[in-house]
Amino acid sequence: MINQKEGFKSGFVSIIGRPNVGKSTLLNHVIGQKIAIMSDKPQTTRNKIQGVYTSEDSQIVFIDTPGIHKPKHKLGDFMMKVAQNTLKEVDLILYVVDGAEAFGPGEEFIIERLKEAKTPVILVINKIDKVHPDDLLSLIETYRHKHEFEEVVPVSALQGNNVPTLLLEITKHLSEGPQYYPSDQVTDHPERFVIAELIREKVLHLTREEIPHSIAVVIEQIKRRQHQDTVYIGATIVVERSSQKGIIIGKQGKMLKEVGQQARADIEALLGSKVFLELWVKVQKDWRNKPQHLRDYGFREDEY
């Protein structure tokens, strides 16, 4: 921990909400760097991702949890367990909802979890750029009747509207405390984890509905080539069926090449170095229901 001036505030804040309400977009906007994987498919975020925001007078450590849902397999069980445990560990919860969607059973389910956790909650209504002001006021009233929120802050995570106000509200609810991380550090995840997430994001984005969330990415090797000032990265994309392997590779390898090109650009921005990225695709049947494979592919409750 780092010495800081008197009155410095710090704390751990969980970002929670249904799939695809913009949790990862919000975290990435605040941090100013792509840390949490973004996709329009549910359950994109699998591990708790710590993003660190530091200002002159505060440090906020964000935990981005998987979208809360009813589990369908062991991977789903793992993701839900991570989400529920997080609620009890943090100082403050940001409950993110989609302002363009009506209150429904999914929101009821989450609010019940919030009541059990007994942690202070700020309601963040996202995507306000898509909502009429009258509808927004009505939605705020609906949520206020369901739970006692510390604050309600409407934002557009994609455009950055009202995000500075949200950061001020978060800081207001934190206690005085130490600076846990250096000012220039934005995550505590190892490089391998972030690189794997960037590759997985490109697969999900480029294959759209053809590939469900039955993929994992394993970083086989990261090697810095000093004389060439480049970083060599070898990674395996794991799928459950041969048909999925064919889709990811694509005709004459075109899809895999495109995944590699797009992922490489993000990885180079992350590392600040030229990157040589080599990708392979492997079939591992039904890996999401096998605890050993979940551990092999990085899903460890005690780590994240």
UniProtKB/Swiss-Prot annotation:
The keyword Ribosomal protein does not apply. Residues 199-285 form the KH type-2 domain. GO terms for cellular component: cytosol; plasma membrane. It is found in: Cytoplasm; Cell membrane. GTP binds at residues 17-24, 64-68, 126-129. One of its GO terms (molecular function) is GTPase activity. Transmembrane segments: none annotated. It holds the Pfam family MMR_HSR1. InterPro entries: G_ERA_dom, GTP-bd, GTPase_Era-like, KH_dom-like_a/b, KH_dom_type_2, KH_sf_prok-type, P-loop_NTPase, Small_GTP-bd. It comes from the Bacteria. The keyword Transmembrane does not apply. GO terms for biological process: ribosomal small subunit assembly. Residues 17-24 are annotated as: G1. Residues 126-129 are annotated as: G4. Monomer. This is GTPase Era. The gene is era.
